[in-house]
Design a protein with these regions (language model features):
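Short, intrinsically disordered, charge-balanced linker/junction segments flanking boundaries
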Residues: 240-242
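Alpha-helical solenoid repeat scaffolds of the TPR/TPR-like class and their adjacent stem/linker regions
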Residues: 1-214, 226, 236
Length: 242
């Protein structure tokens, strides 16, 4: 019985087996909505074509993390394609566009039409930067966007279906003991899976406590997350540590 979507469950507990079960239930529902399956793909390209799919090619944390990856791809060996399935472009969209061989805004397209466009562009590897977060296009990958489909960065949980071949992670995000709870094969990056920008600009503005109506002497605790992630178990753990 389906009782919750996969994404919010990630913040409610760290039971990877439950995460897999919920992801599989959600994926099964998505699969049932797809007709005319075809896993036949194009012949090999001269250069490998990598398609990055994201609703966050804009001023968004995923955008800031992935930017240098897109910038530093060896363009002599790879053609890089961008598929933006988010609702609104901004100045960061303009910045990232120049790092793609081709860039498509596919927000108005259906999941199945996005898969068709990817096939028409003969994408060899589809990298999903969204997972089950907002504006996800799960059915694109069930339909088949590329011969190889990878879950990376935006959603560090399993997609729970056989249509994703790999998840890019590290031994902290997915330790070997948890491989059984991932439908994908796990590809490890050394040290840390999370890409980042090498030249992040740090604000030079000095903030004062009074700007935020904070007392001058008290210790200030901060949690820079959505408040739904602060549940009784998490809060009790903080109190125990303190």
């Amino acid at each position: 019985k389906k009782i919750i979507r996969p994404f919010p469950l990630l913040s409610l507990n760290d039971n990877q087996n439950q995460h897999k079960i919920v992801a599989e239930q959600y994926a099964k529902e998505q699969i049932s909505q797809i007709s005319n399956f075809s896993r036949m793909f194009h012949k090999k390209n001269d250069k490998i074509r990598i398609g990055y799919f994201s609703p966050d090619f804009k001023n968004h944390p995923v955008m800031h993390l992935i930017l240098d990856v897109l910038k530093n791809h060896d363009k002599s060996k790879f053609d890089i394609y961008g598929f933006f399935h988010g609702p609104q472009e901004d100045e960061w969209t303009d910045i990232v566009k120049k790092y793609f061989h081709k860039f498509y805004n596919v927000y108005e397209k259906s999941d199945e039409d996005i898969a068709t466009l990817s096939r028409e562009n003969k994408i060899d590897i589809a990298v999903d930067l969204c997972g089950y977060t907002k504006y996800s296009i799960t059915k694109t990958y069930i339909k088949g966007a590329a011969p190889i489909q990878i879950n990376y960065l935006g959603y560090p949980g399993t997609m729970g279906n056989k249509y994703f071949n790999y998840i890019i992670a590290d031994k902290h995000i997915v330790p070997p003991s948890e491989f059984k709870n991932f439908s994908e094969k796990v590809l490890y990056l050394p040290n840390c899976y999370q890409a980042n920008q090498s030249k992040i600009k740090i604000s030079k503005k000095n903030f004062d406590r009074k700007d935020f109506k904070l007392p001058n002497e008290s210790f200030v605790f901060a949690c820079l997350n959505n408040n739904y992630k602060i549940n009784p178990i998490i809060f009790a753990s903080w109190m125990k540590i303190l």
